């Protein structure tokens, strides 16, 4: 393992971190909405998103790097921001869903603009599956 990461390694690591961050955020916001007795599908989306963690850990290892986790303090601050958004929103569920959509958009942009798929057909399939998951989550959250 080299000290300097290749672009592919950096992209794969960032995708893994965003997968974990979005799943954790969905779960935390789901708990917040559940505490308010608001119906939502955030836990189901988080569960499905978490299925990609092991897959992308494998991609990172395949590229010769070691997987890492997101910054816990940053995740905590983002969760506080989500809770504040929900607290001051006229429609708490919609506000939280919009926050989730914003986070997914960042992940979707990275999934659609990286060059990881050029390394192997297996990595390309994993990226396509994650992209399908992101589109499905967007459809659920935006009510399409």
Predicted regions and their residues:
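Alpha-helical scaffold segments that form or flank carboxylate-/histidine-based iron centers
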Residues: 7-15, 34-55, 93-96, 121-136
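Structural signal for well-ordered, non-membrane alpha-helices
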Residues: 20-23, 27, 50-57, 108, ...
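Carboxylate-rich helix-loop segments that flank metal/cofactor sites and access channels
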Residues: 58-98, 102, 106
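Long, hydrophobic, amphipathic alpha-helical segments used as structural scaffolds
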Residues: 34, 57-60, 64, 92, ...
């Amino acid at each position: 393992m080299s000290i300097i990461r290749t672009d592919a390694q950096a992209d794969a690591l960032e995708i893994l971190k965003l997968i974990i961050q979005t799943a954790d955020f969905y779960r935390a916001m789901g708990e917040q909405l559940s505490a308010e007795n608001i119906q939502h599908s955030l836990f189901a989306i988080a569960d499905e998103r978490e299925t990609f963690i092991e897959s992308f850990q494998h991609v990172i290892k395949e590229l010769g790097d070691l997987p890492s986790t997101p910054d816990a303090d940053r995740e905590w601050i983002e969760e506080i921001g989500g809770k504040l958004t929900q607290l001051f929103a006229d429609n708490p569920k919609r506000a939280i869903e919009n926050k989730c959509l914003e986070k997914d958009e960042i992940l979707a942009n990275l999934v659609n603009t990286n060059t990881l798929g050029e390394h192997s057909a297996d990595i390309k399939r994993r990226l396509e599956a994650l992209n399908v998951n992101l589109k499905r989550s967007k459809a659920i959250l935006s009510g399409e």
